[in-house]
Structures are given as structure tokens and as C-alpha cells.
Amino acid sequence: VKALVIGHRGMLGTDLMDHLAAEGHEAVGLDLPEIDITDRRQVIRKVSEAAPDVVFHLAAWTDVDGAEEHEEQALLVNGEGTRNVAIASREAGAALVAVSTDYVFPGTGGPYQEDSATDPIQAYGRTKLAGERLAELEYPEGTRIARTAWLYGTHGRNFVDTMIGLGTDPSRDHVDVVADQTGCPTSTRDLCPALVAVADLPPGVYHCAGGGSTTWAGFCREAFRLAEVDCEVRDTTTEAFARPAPRPEVSVLEVTHGGAPRLRAWEDALADYIRERS
């Protein structure tokens, strides 16, 4: 299979390129500055030149708080940009796997299934949902939406590394971590084979997140336990950490599609990540 990865230099994209190569697939990557997904003509030309069998669309505006102030710009990238990739994929006759987020849900009534009602509570979620809908509108016969959550991996800034950095600071005896948000920590390493599997499934919406769920505080405690970090984790509230963008309380993604890939328990994936980083 020849794959095109748009956004291949990011945390997920780097792992996906490695995974595709390891599985014997031909993989081509495009990212800024060589592609601007908001430029439709350029996207169509670049995808056509790559002549892929499948397009993995990972490029996105991912600054959740920044999107509150710059929703128009975020919408241009996450909405129109995704539409452009869908149009280009359609014209190239390639399957499209577009990565989306748990933030398309309001976070008040999870866990959420693939067909649960969407109702994002922040600009970032609204722009990602717009991208989902525009891709399905332009290319219903070829678009697969893969929603994921709470990503961490070797090739980018992430919660696990940040917290271990804080926890190993000799001047600290504790860290305060939010305990009233619940989600599914997802390893980029585990997500990659799931995305490849989704490319072979019928068009539609798929949930691809770590098995089980926890709070940010629970996630941090397990990371500290595995990494043998001697630092107390104290529960705190979302309210105590005021941020521009509201966060969902419960954004647990449930897999109900029979043929959909199921990721292993988040604790097992985290154990591997901690082992590899030490």
C-alpha cells in the first residue's frame, strides 16, 4: 500500500511514518512548509503527485486554548483544510483517514459511542467537528473519521513527560493535578496500527483510544508509579486551573463497531512508554 501522511512531522505523524515503513508500506510525508492545507489547489496538486492508495490526515490546529481567541484561523485549518484534503483524496481515488478528537462531545454524559450526539463546548471542538462534517460531505464514499483522545508519544511535548519533569524537580514535594476530567490516555505507538486498520474498514466514524479510562490525576499517579517518581499527586479541580477553553468532564470514547480495532488498556501502553523512555 502507498500511503500519504499529511502532518508527518508531528508526534503522531512521526510514529505513523515509522510504523508504515516497518510494515513494508511505501509512505510519503507532507507537512508545513511544503504543504498548506488551506490552499485547495496546492493540496489537490500535491496529493495527485503522491498518487497514494490511502491518505492519513493528521495536520491540524491543535492549540485548544489558542483556538478560543482565534477560532476563525483554527476553523480555516481544521474545517476548510480537512475539506481540501477530502476533495484531493477523492480526486486521487484514495481512501481518507482523518484524525479527530473526543472534544467533539460536550463531556457531560459519556462514555460516547461513534453515533452519540456531538455538541462541542469549545472552539477547538467546533472546528474539528466542522472538519469531520465537511470531509464526509465532500467524500462520503471514501472518508473514515478516527477520533482519539489524550495523546502522548515519544516525538512531541506531552502530559507524561511534563509531569515526570515536574515530579523529579528536587524543589517539589507534590504536584497538583486535575481530578474532575475523565478520558482515555492513548499512546501514539498504539494508535498507528489502529489507523492503518481503519483505512481498510468501510467509510464512517471510528473511535480509536486507549482501553479503559482515568482522570488526569490518575494518569499522573500511574506514570509516577511506573517511573518510580517519589512525588505526591494531589487532586485538584478544573476550576483551580483556569484556562481560556472549557474542557469536557467525561470524554471517554467507546468502541461499538464490530470490526473496529480495539486498543489495549491504557495502563499497559503507558508501562511500555515509561520502559522505553527510561
Where are these regions (language model features)?
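N-terminal Rossmann NAD(P)H-binding glycine-rich loop of SDR-like oxidoreductase domains
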Residues: 3-21
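SDR active-site strand-loop-helix element
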Residues: 6, 30, 55-59, 96-101, ...
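Adenosine-cofactor binding site in Rossmann-like domains, unifying the SAM/SAH pocket
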Residues: 21-45
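NAD(P)H-binding glycine-rich loop region in Rossmannoid oxidoreductase-like domains
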Residues: 40-77, 88-90
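Catalytic helix-loop patch of NAD(P)-dependent Rossmann-fold dehydrogenases
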Residues: 76-84, 104-146, 150-151
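NAD(P)-dependent short-chain dehydrogenase/reductase
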Residues: 133-183, 188-190
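Mid/C-terminal beta-alpha module of Rossmann-like enzyme folds, strongest
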Residues: 192-195, 200-244, 274-277
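C-terminal amphipathic/interface module of NAD(P)-dependent oxidoreductases
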Residues: 231, 246-278
